[in-house]
Each structure stands twice: as C-alpha cells, then as structure tokens.
C-alpha cells in the first residue's frame, strides 16, 4: 500500500492525477505494468469525473468510466456500462484504466486474523509534491431562478388547434 499524504496545498484533480500517475509509474518500474488501474467513477467531494481520465492519459492507456461489471480474458478487459434497457460493453486492451461505479462489487469484510495481519503490513509513504496544477475557481454564482407555468391546452384531439396556435406564437411554425 502506498500513502500519498495531502499536506501542502489544495489538491485539485490535476494535481491528484499527476501524483497518482507518478506513483503508479514508479511502482510499475519495479514490478512491471498493472493490468488494470481502478478508480472510483467520481470523487465524493467535487464529483469532477477527472482523476481517472487524467491518470489514463498520463500513462497512455485506454479508459472507460461508469463501469458496473468487468471481465478479463486473453489480454482484454470487457467493461460493462449500464444504460437504459441494458448494457454497453467496451473491450479494451490491457493495461487499462477503469472508473467503476458504486455497487460493482460486494465488499468482503476482513476476519480478525486479517485485521491483525494488516497491522503488520508495510505502508510506503510517498512524499510526492503536489506539483503543477492549481485549478482556480474564478467565480461561483447562483443563476437567477425562473418560474415557469404549465398551461394545459386541452386533452386529446381537441387540444391540437391550441397547440398549433401556441407554436405559431412562439415562432416555431410559420
């Protein structure tokens, strides 16, 4: 396990991705490339959907986000993304980066023996600098709320003339 402590500056998605891509590259230089690098689909704080995509780009790997299922065989990851009425399936060559959605797995809780063993596990602290980045919020404002009214123009075929009149008034029909 590698721990990258967050101490010095705000870690925006650009800085976070740079640090993680650097850590992955450093470990891969020793142990060889990982078949899959998995990320959550989005962060809980900013919800930017950026970190996994940025890491994939930095590592030069294909990326698929929004994944609800994964199968790996013969150097290819089949990643399933849920859509209305079914799934989209993406076959990507390994190594790859995937952004997974909540519910992709059922958590396995450690046994007491596993918990005790984890206390002895080595944790490598990577004192990586935040580096370049610095996405800056320029401004944040709430848009003016608009109130819209729903007008029922009738029901069934009797409503057709009223709808045509409204569309002509709006300039949709001429």
Task: Kindly give the residue locations of the regions a language model identified.
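N-terminal glycine-rich FAD/FM-binding segment characteristic of electron-transfer flavoproteins
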Residues: 1-174
